[in-house]
Amino acid sequence: TLNIYYTTGDDWNLGQFPDRYRGEWEANAGWLRLAFHAYANDPPRPYQDAPVEKLLADLDLINAEIHRFAGPEAFSPAVVVHFGMTRPEAWGPLYDRGSRVLGGYFRKSPQGQWDINYRMDDARSEWLSRHDLLKDFASGMIFSKVDIVVNSTPLDKIVPALEPVVADPRQGEIIDLLTHEQYFWPLYERYLPDHAERMDRAIGFVTGRGHRPVFLQDGFLGGPES
């Protein structure tokens, strides 16, 4: 799933993207889908303290554009909100708009506070830091711990980072891989020449151990509902 913005922050936005490629999006929807991430890359943590109405307005705006230029087959409900931080009051409305799983880091910041956790309480954040998933029954939302950020992990550290996760029955059933695609771009100031190789190493490692790719928003965690 590609998590996308509405605007680059200058003079371009999704409303300018043509629908001439819609057939290609639809033809490839079996492996490639688009989902809301945020209105823009900046500012950081845009929804951490923002009113829920702001998050939902941006979500609806981007969802409408995805349906327009890519079609419903290529659309995914939100999977990762930018910086993985929202008010807890947003979990229910996000569920009502189709999200069933939200991914985050669920780890402590340098200041010792649980972070990138959708403002979840400390007890559940700590539990989720050691497990695959946790369901908030009040909202219905399931939270998934991201197991590796590929662009932040050197090539030779990827397998060592994933090996203990795969070996742990509390964490190894679902492997949540995440990267930031700008590291593929030679024009990006922090371009990583080996980014594609890092992705290949991570995906190859987990598929080599029997895992298969799924869309977590489909059915129940990518599998049938019953």
Predicted regions span which residues?
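Active-site-adjacent pocket scaffolds in enzyme catalytic domains
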Residues: 10-16, 20, 73, 80-176
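Metal-dependent polysaccharide deacetylase catalytic core of the NodB/CE4 family, i.e.
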Residues: 2-87, 110-111, 181-185
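C-terminal domain-boundary segment and adjacent tail
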Residues: 101-106, 176-226
